[in-house]
């Protein structure tokens, strides 16, 4: 079994002062302590390690080979320890840390992009890890505390112990080819899409499970003719006349050639929410929440 040493950092600081000064009196003055206790501490360290660190003369000391090695390693260890403690202080102030953030793909369009860009620029020591997951998976990861927060378009309230905050209001639009027979409508009834073919993305990237339920509430299940991974590919296929899609209004900013966007007559909210465990908010998360909700 590997030996566990009980030497604390204070003993190493005492040793390093003597090793650098090569004189107990000067080292004691540097440490603002008297010489006898310093000599006792150095002897204690030598006893713990079972080796002599200094050769003592009447007016000076010389490092042994073991002492020279310990001096090099002690400098490195104390610098590392100081860096670790400084980082923990930064984490406590929200100036550093890591945030595991679940997102649906559609969340990264619209207002969130400039907000996140500014947050990352202003907090360079906060590492935000984006994990693209469908809402149900995000909620499961939140409950297992594998995510700090999740962002999706809410259809239900979160479980007890979790908080949801609306980041901004949004709505779903119909994206269709510009020559589509519904393009003359200023608003499109959802039931008018009953016989249309849909192009969409997998649930991990989008809100399609929610949209399917909304369509079923007005009496039809949408027919998916193509499923692709990127919103740009969805809109490219819409522009080719392959099908239509329901998409958050933030995508209308993309201004795709050959694609027109129309609001639905029955507004389907696409409001974006952030969900997190109420009692597990780190200082870095507090800063992120402030940035996202200001």
From Swiss-Prot:
PANTHER family, A to Z: HTH-TYPE TRANSCRIPTIONAL REGULATOR XAPR, TRANSCRIPTIONAL DUAL REGULATOR HCAR-RELATED
CDD domains: PBP2_XapR
DNA-binding region listed in the record: 24-43
Organism: Escherichia coli (strain K12)
Organism ancestry: Bacteria, Pseudomonadati, Pseudomonadota, Gammaproteobacteria, Enterobacterales
Domain called HTH lysR-type: residue spans: 7-64
Entry's Gene Ontology molecular function annotations: DNA binding; DNA-binding transcription factor activity
Segment forming the signal sequence: none
GO biological process, one term: regulation of DNA-templated transcription
Function text: Positive regulator required for the expression of xapA and xapB. Binds to the inducer xanthosine.
Keywords in alphabetical order: Activator, DNA-binding, Transcription, Transcription regulation
Gene3D superfamilies reported in the protein's UniProt record: Periplasmic binding protein-like II (3.40.190.10), Winged helix-like DNA-binding domain superfamily/Winged helix DNA-binding domain (1.10.10.10)
Family membership: Belongs to the LysR transcriptional regulatory family.
SUPFAM superfamilies: Periplasmic binding protein-like II (SSF53850), Winged helix' DNA-binding domain (SSF46785)
GO CC terms, sorted: protein-DNA complex
Entry-linked InterPro entries: LysR_subst-bd, Tscrpt_reg_HTH_LysR, WH-like_DNA-bd_sf, WH_DNA-bd_sf, XapR_PBP2
Descriptive protein name: HTH-type transcriptional regulator XapR
């Amino acid at each position: 079994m590997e030996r566990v040493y009980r030497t604390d950092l204070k003993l190493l600081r005492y040793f390093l002062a003597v090793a650098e000064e090569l004189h107990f009196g000067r080292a004691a003055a540097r440490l603002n302590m008297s010489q006898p206790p310093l000599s006792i501490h150095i002897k204690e360290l030598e006893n713990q390690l079972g080796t002599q660190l200094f050769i003592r003369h009447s007016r000076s000391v010389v490092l042994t080979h073991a002492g020279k090695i310990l001096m090099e390693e002690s400098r490195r260890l104390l610098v590392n320890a100081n860096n670790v403690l400084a980082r923990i202080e930064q984490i406590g102030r929200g100036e550093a840390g890591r945030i595991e953030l679940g997102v649906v793909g559609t969340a990264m369009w619209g207002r969130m992009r400039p907000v996140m860009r500014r947050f990352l620029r202003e907090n360079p020591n906060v590492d935000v890890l984006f994990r693209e997951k469908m809402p149900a998976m995000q909620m499961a990861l939140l409950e297992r505390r594998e995510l700090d927060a999740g962002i999706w378009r809410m259809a239900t309230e979160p479980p007890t112990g979790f908080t949801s905050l609306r980041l901004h209001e949004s709505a779903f639009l119909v994206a269709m080819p510009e020559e589509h027979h519904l393009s003359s409508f200023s608003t499109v009834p959802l039931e008018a899409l009953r016989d249309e073919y849909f192009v969409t993305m997998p649930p991990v990237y989008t809100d399609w499970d929610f949209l399917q339920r909304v369509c079923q509430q007005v009496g039809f299940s949408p027919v998916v003719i193509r499923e692709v991974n990127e919103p740009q590919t969805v809109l490219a296929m819409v522009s080719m006349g392959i099908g239509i899609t329901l998409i958050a209004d933030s995508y209308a900013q993309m201004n795709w050639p050959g694609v027109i966007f129309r609001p639905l007559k029955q507004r389907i909210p696409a409001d974006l929410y952030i969900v997190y465990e109420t009692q597990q908010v780190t200082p870095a998360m507090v800063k992120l929440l402030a940035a996202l909700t200001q």
